[in-house]
């Protein structure tokens, strides 16, 4: 039997239906409906079993057929949606034939290799991936022992879901980007070489972003016609299923109008292929909507984007419109984009802190928090930068995902999901067409 709704508690006393908050009333109705559906299906199944035992072979065949229909119809139409609404999940098995190889810089990051390894082990359980984990073997095994994931690591190696690839001394977070030339066998260089040799379809690193970009340019090379690669990050919008791609968010501090034009072309292809937007709306980040607003970079870039026939240019995008859902791609210089990125990373925690502070204290506050808990978790998930744990380096001849230096396991899983999505949607094929047009 489903538990009674909040309105049936004797401690609350009689209350009219109209005085109950609308959100609570909807939750009660939703819960009762789900409980009613479950009760009806359970009763029907029980009755069918009794009828089958009494009716003999013929009835048993009918019941068996009914059970098959119930499992094929009621399961996807009733129980699976209820399980998703109630926050549950039931992972389906992953066919090993569908797994794609991704090279992971295991030594990149503030706390590597521990959190990176932990995230990779979680990712191969959730995503159709195989991981080439590059790093210093002694440090990898020590991290696995410290996190008590040694058995899980060995199982992944035995199943050929993860392969440890040895590398030399790693590049530190404080090293200059030019260190990639001196430390030729560093983990990030080995990872890039695996992609270049087609032994992996994508590379992920949470290491020194300057070194990652330098290694990608030196090892993979730039696409023909692209002067500067750009880092593109996905930001949440009002529509949960429609993120906006913002680039550049940190690769190029000083830009020319031609660079922003190229960023728009790169972002247009990614939005179309991976985000499945048929005609992406391109916006230019500016201080006003009018064509005459902005500095020289903005004014000259506006002209290039407006005259580009391959783009659906939607005009200037003010800061308040980035998350509005009115644009699919927003282009800017790397300095401005990085400031915007770091600001938005703080929004989730600040917003949740304000909501918690405004909830009333005492019994009413606890009751309200209980009903809002799932909503707050969904809000946090949409705004938490760990859920968008990686950014694509667009403009190099390979799929490269850059993660936060402070990435934990959840961020690693999110970044690897992004890498898999880009690799499985044929982004590089369309980028090759772009370089033939620009060349």
Located regions from the model:
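Phosphate/nucleotide-donor binding subsite
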Residues: 153-197
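Glycine-rich phosphate/nucleotide-binding loop
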Residues: 217-246, 326-330, 334-439
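N-terminal phosphate-binding or glycine-rich loops at protein starts, especially the Walker A/P-loop
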Residues: 76-142
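Short, glycine-rich nucleotide/cofactor-binding loops
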Residues: 101-114, 251-261, 402-408
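Composition-driven recognition of long, low-complexity, acid-poor segments enriched in small hydrophobic
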Residues: 36-74, 78
């Amino acid at each position: 039997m489903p538990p009674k709704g909040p309105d049936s508690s004797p401690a609350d006393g009689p209350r009219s239906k109209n005085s109950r908050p609308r959100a609570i009333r909807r939750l009660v109705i939703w819960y009762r409906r789900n409980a009613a559906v479950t009760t009806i299906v359970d009763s029907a199944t029980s009755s069918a079993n009794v009828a089958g035992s009494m009716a003999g072979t013929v009835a048993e065949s009918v019941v068996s057929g009914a059970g098959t229909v119930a499992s094929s119809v009621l399961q996807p139409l009733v129980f699976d949606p209820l399980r998703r609404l109630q926050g549950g999940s039931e992972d389906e098995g992953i066919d090993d034939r569908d797994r794609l190889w991704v090279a992971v810089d295991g030594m990149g990051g503030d706390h590597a290799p521990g959190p990176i390894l932990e995230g990779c082990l979680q990712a191969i359980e959730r995503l159709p991936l195989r991981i080439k984990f590059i790093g210093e073997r002694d440090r990898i095994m020590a991290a696995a022992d410290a996190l008590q994931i040694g058995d899980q690591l060995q199982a992944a190696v035995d199943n050929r879901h993860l392969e440890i690839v040895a590398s030399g001394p790693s590049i530190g977070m404080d090293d200059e980007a030019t260190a990639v030339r001196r430390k030729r066998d560093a983990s990030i260089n080995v990872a890039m070489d695996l992609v270049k040799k087609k032994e992996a379809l994508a590379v992920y690193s949470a290491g020194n972003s300057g070194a990652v970009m330098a290694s990608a340019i030196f090892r993979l090379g730039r696409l023909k016609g692209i002067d500067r690669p750009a880092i593109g990050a996905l930001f949440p919008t009002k529509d949960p299923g429609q993120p906006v791609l913002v680039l550049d968010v940190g690769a190029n501090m000083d830009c020319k109008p031609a660079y922003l034009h190229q960023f728009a072309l790169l972002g247009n292809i990614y939005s179309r292929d991976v985000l499945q937007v048929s005609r992406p709306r391109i916006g230019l980040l500016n201080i006003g909507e009018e064509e005459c607003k902005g500095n020289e970079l903005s004014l000259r870039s506006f002209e290039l984007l407006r005259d580009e026939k391959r783009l659906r240019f939607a005009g200037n995008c003010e800061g308040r419109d980035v998350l509005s859902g009115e644009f699919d791609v927003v282009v800017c210089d790397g300095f401005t984009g990085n400031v915007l990125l770091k600001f938005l990373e703080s929004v989730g925690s600040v917003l949740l802190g304000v909501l918690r502070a405004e909830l009333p204290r005492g019994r009413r506050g606890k009751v309200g928090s209980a009903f809002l808990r799932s909503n707050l978790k969904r809000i946090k998930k949409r705004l938490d930068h760990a859920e968008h744990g990686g950014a694509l380096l667009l403009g190099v001849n390979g799929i490269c995902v850059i993660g936060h230096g402070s990435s934990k396991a959840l961020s690693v899983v999110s970044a690897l999901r992004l890498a898999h999505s880009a690799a499985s949607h044929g982004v590089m094929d369309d980028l090759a067409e772009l370089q033939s047009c620009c060349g």
